Amino acid sequence: MRFISADYLYTLHSKPIKNGVLQINNFGEIINIFKNKTEIPSQNIEFFNGLLCPGFINAHCHLELSHLHNTSNSVNGFSEFLEIVKTRDNYSKAFIIRAIKSAEDQMIKNGIVAVGDICNTIDTLELKINKKLHYYNFIESFEVKTEKSKEAIAKALLIRDVFRNNNLKATITPHSAYSVTPDLMRLIANVSDESDYTFSIHNQETEEENILFKDKKGQFRDWLQSINASPKIWNNRSSSFSVLNELRCKRVIFVHNTYTNLLDLKDEYYCTCPCANLFIENKLPNYSIFSSDNLCVGTDSLASNSQLSIIKELALIEQNSDYSLEELLKIGCKNGAKALGFSKYGTFEVGKTPGVNLITGFELSLTDSKVQKIV
């Protein structure tokens, strides 16, 4: 049993507690929360200078792309970034697995306890079986030709079932509105079952996506036409959010939202990956339109980020928004847990096992702050 205290305890369930104390058992479960350290004999308390918050939730990652780290120092837009991703198979399996392991170790060190991870392969399977982190595996499906929709869903089902057969959470999800035909979207909806809590979809990452659906023209349309894509992709959709009706789903996490505006917003969760946004498009979302109650944060992959650190992502959001410190921590912890359906994470509450992070050096901003995993 441990009694852990700090200058401030950010429960993210109630107001911050000055000199609050967490009572935690050997399994990391919160047994009690004390509002004042005087309630506990001082010799039993581990006191830290700084603030304590729950473990971070990385709501969007591509762990299987970790081997593409430092492939390029910069790219000029989304199309150039896709060229990097296309090289993913030019590496040995051993090299890929080592990079995946190193990336997970980095996330653990940086206080991340759970991840929404995009999967196109089973490269991460062996690592995830060890359950050092809690993963929601989104089996990504995409196909722009109607006649290949059944082939695409069959491949996704094979991968999903491998994860599920190893007791790992897995849901087939569309990559994006522009890369999935209406036929494939219908098939994805049809294979969804009661264990699928949410979908995760790349959304409005570039302005060209908006032009495609609104004006039925632009670089995306030209590219799609050049590869003989089904015109139903843009003709049948008035916006990226048209997929909500096609999926007939309960929940969606829309990822990136770099070119999302206030009128676009639906009652869903939105995940921002600011470091990756700057790397790929050199642009950030307009954070003023997003409520701090349904915005979560991800690192994206090491192909588009120098590190997997939620505190660094939050610092960048802080520099470009008016969110308070408590709101930023909710974005980094509570909201991601809610978006992914991870009920044991995200807040300090009795009965939960959320992990405990110590944050120091945050007096003026998160830019110079550091995180240390305590539990």
Positions of the model-derived regions?
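Active-site glycine- and acidic-residue-rich loops that bind
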Residues: 116, 173-189, 278-281
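Hydrophobic faces of well-ordered beta-strands that scaffold small-molecule active sites
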Residues: 55-59, 115-116, 135-139, 170-174, ...
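Active-site beta-loop-alpha junctions enriched in small/polar residues
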Residues: 62, 120, 140-144, 175-177, ...
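Alpha-helical scaffold segments that flank or form the walls of functional sites
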Residues: 23, 51-52, 69-132, 154-165
